[in-house]
Amino acid sequence: MAYFNQHQSMISKRYLTFFSKSKKKKPFSTGQLIGLILGPLLFLLTLLFFHPQDLPWKGVYVLAITLWIATWWITEAIPIAATSLLPIVLLPLGHILTPEQVSSEYGNDIIFLFLGGFILAIAMERWNLHTRVALTIINLIGASTSKILLGFMVATGFLSMFVSNTAAVMIMIPIGLAIIKEAHDLQEANTNQTSIQKFEKSLVLAIGYAGTIGGLGTLIGTPPLIILKGQYMQHFGHEISFAKWMIVGIPTVIVLLGITWLYLRYVAFRHDLKYLPGGQTLIKQKLDELGKMKYEEKVVQTIFVLASLLWITREFLLKKWEVTSSVADGTIAIFISILLFIIPAKNTEKHRRIIDWEVAKELPWGVLILFGGGLALAKGISESGLAKWLGEQLKSLNGVSPILIVIVITIFVLFLTEVTSNTATATMILPILATLSVAVGVHPLLLMAPAAMAANCAYMLPVGTPPNAIIFGSGKISIKQMASVGFWVNLISAIIIILVVYYIMPIVLGIDINQPLPLK
């Protein structure tokens, strides 16, 4: 257990060191300083010199603030969450929306869905249920190196459907490093050292990649999918249900995990180490250290199952009853959260109830503000006439094969998100694609869904996504190795996303990909 804690501390230090090389911090990096100036400059230049005849002044104004906000999001000139507050100032100034209309977008149902999801995830982490679930999955799968690799991927992928990708990887990487240490300590005389090194690299990357892949399974698994749900509702007035997305997302996760596992085990890091000395023993030892499931764990497990059932059955059960017909996914998330605040804990030395307001310190408020900013900006784009104008300009793409557009969008976003925040990428790209769908005459989800899924899938660089930074911080993998392996996982993801969106999603969601929806 000491080794486990030691490595968790080591990862945190390396993770922080990666992002802060120098002790003497400058107020702005060169890139941030350029972005800080470029954003307002683009705003002014657009207002002064961009006046197309068929775009009203309000549309020009919203385009100008979109360029400003997008520039600050990409360069992170100021914190992304702070940039996301700009619509509250700029949209009323241009008489696009009233302050009340703008502010209401920051309290959208989608934001409360994610807030409730965060609270449930923190409850799992507080009472260590997440660790028990992960270790149990690994223990059940087996002791060969291939099965251990698969076990870690399944456990991490499952966790990241319900807790953040970052949290899932932070939970699993110390356990993985403990197994790697055990492999080195117990290696037999005839064991090839190169094989152990290949196994450790494959295991570290498997954990990071599975954390990213698993987020695609549910609407609360990763921010880009929450943004997809919100933008789709904002632009077209239609809803993506939690249950239906799981029918699309979970098979995608299973296929991606399976192919990535095969690639890591038999192509990228092929080795001769078939069984890991002491691997299964170590997992069982850690399970024994957890002891029997405690009261608080049972409560969180029950609440988790209840939340899942309510989300899954809302479309075909709750909507049929008059009393619950108006219940949304966010309503369920907050109901579940309130239950966690009410139910008392037995281990009162730690906490009086399952969750208390101390949880507020751990909640990612910045992410929630970013969602709100994206929704407010989307409403401004719609209300100002900018969305309609963009659609007219994009009509030149009419006649281009929809599958070709999907391929270009998926690959473009996949590689863009390697150097930009996945949340900011989705927030910027999805409103444009909503308009593009009308212009080219296809269903909006045909363009928006692959972009949101691709925005989540960054595998090449440590800066691409926090899970990548965490596994890089383990010291077991170099940037060059991550980039070369991640490039192929990017391409695998692109192929799977395109196939799922084009052939499976329309059947599951009951949509006609060649039938556009009118903008609200």
Curated annotation (Swiss-Prot):
Entry GO MF terms: organic anion transmembrane transporter activity; symporter activity
Principal location listed in the UniProt entry: membrane
Signal peptide segment: none
Membrane topology annotation: Multi-pass membrane protein
Subcellular location: Cell membrane
Annotated transmembrane regions: 30-50, 55-75, 77-97, 104-124, 160-180, 207-227, 242-262, 298-318, 323-343, 362-382, 399-419, 428-448, 452-472, 491-511
GO cellular component terms, semicolon-separated: plasma membrane
Keywords in alphabetical order: Cell membrane, Ion transport, Membrane, Sodium, Sodium transport, Symport, Transmembrane, Transmembrane helix, Transport
Biological process annotations from GO: carboxylic acid transmembrane transport; sodium ion transport
Function: Mediates the transport of the dicarboxylates fumarate, malate, and succinate across the cytoplasmic membrane via a Na(+)-electrochemical gradient.
Similarity annotation: Belongs to the SLC13A/DASS transporter (TC 2.A.47) family. NADC subfamily.
Protein name, per record: Sodium-dependent dicarboxylate transporter SdcS
Provenance organism: Staphylococcus aureus (strain MRSA252)
Source taxonomy: Bacteria, Bacillati, Bacillota, Bacilli, Bacillales
